[in-house]
C-alpha cells in the first residue's frame, strides 16, 4: 500500500501535479498539455510543494544540528509533514478534472497510502513517533518529493535541467528501498500498541453486525509489500534505462 507511494510510483503520466515515477513517459513522447490557466496553477502548486518539502528538509537539518542526534527528529517537522503530505490530496482532483493525464485510481491509491501512514499509523500510534524507522521514510519521502515537484515545475516550463531528470530517474534506486524499509518497520513497531489498545477495531456484537480488526489489517498491508515492491522496483529500473538512454541519444543528435 504505502510502498507504492514511497517513490511516487512507477506508472502514470506525470504532468505536473499527478504522481508518477520512473515509469512516466514524459522523456520519450510529447502529450497535449493543460491550458495556460491550468499550467499556471500547476506551476504554482508544484513550486509551493517543492518549497514545503524544502522546509521539511531544512527543519530536519536544523533539528539535527541543534540536538546533535538523529533520534526523535520527527517532532521537529511533524506539522509541515502532515500539512504538505495531506496537501497532495489535491493531486487526485487534478487527475479527476483532467488537468493532469494520470489515472485517478492509481493516483488516489498512491496519495492515500502516504496519508494513511502519516495519520492512521504515525499520528494515531504516538509511541512509534520516536522510532528511527519514521525518520527513515521521512528522509526518503523528503528527497523524493523535492526532486519530483522540481521535475514537474521545470517540465511545465519546458526547461527541464538534465540533473533533475537524472536525479528523478536514479536516486529512487536507494530511496525506494529506504522508504519501504522505514514504512514497514514503522507499521511493525505500531502493531503491539494497536493490538493492546484495540485501535480502530470494531468487535461483535454490534447493531451493524460488522467487525474489523485493524491489527490484522496492518499485517495484510505489510504482506502486500511482498509482491508490490519487487514488481515496481524492477519496472522502474527498466524505465530508467529507457528514458535516460533516450536522453543520451537525443543529446548526440543535437
From Swiss-Prot:
The modification N-acetylalanine is found at residue 2. The active site is at residues 176, 183. One of its GO terms (molecular function) is very-long-chain (3R)-3-hydroxyacyl-CoA dehydratase activity. It is found in: Endoplasmic reticulum membrane. GO terms for biological process: fatty acid elongation; long-chain fatty-acyl-CoA biosynthetic process; sphingolipid biosynthetic process; very long-chain fatty acid biosynthetic process. GO terms for cellular component: endoplasmic reticulum; endoplasmic reticulum membrane. Glycans are attached at residue 209. Keywords: Acetylation, Endoplasmic reticulum, Fatty acid biosynthesis, Fatty acid metabolism, Glycoprotein, Lipid biosynthesis, Lipid metabolism, Lyase, Membrane, Transmembrane, Transmembrane helix. Pfam families: PTPLA (PF04387). Residues 11-33 are annotated as: Disordered. It is a multi-pass membrane protein. The chain crosses the membrane at residues 42-60, 80-97, 108-125, 131-146, 170-187, 218-235. InterPro entries: Tyr_Pase-like_PTPLA. Residues 198-214 are annotated as: May be involved in interaction with TECR. Its EC number is 4.2.1.134. Belongs to the very long-chain fatty acids dehydratase HACD family. Catalyzes the third of the very long-chain fatty acids (VLCFA) elongation four-step cycle (condensation, reduction, dehydration, and reduction). This endoplasmic reticulum-elongation process is characterized by the addition of two carbons to the lipid chain through each cycle. This enzyme catalyzes the dehydration of the 3-hydroxyacyl-CoA intermediate into trans-2,3-enoyl-CoA, within each cycle of elongation. Therefore, it participates in the production of various VLCFAs involved in multiple biological processes as precursors of membrane lipids and lipid mediators. May interact with enzymes of the ELO family (including ELOVL1); with those enzymes that mediate condensation, the first of the four steps of the reaction cycle responsible for fatty acids elongation, may be part of a larger fatty acids elongase complex. Interacts with BCAP31. Interacts (via the third lumenal loop) with TECR. This is Very-long-chain (3R)-3-hydroxyacyl-CoA dehydratase 2. It comes from Homo sapiens. The gene is HACD2.
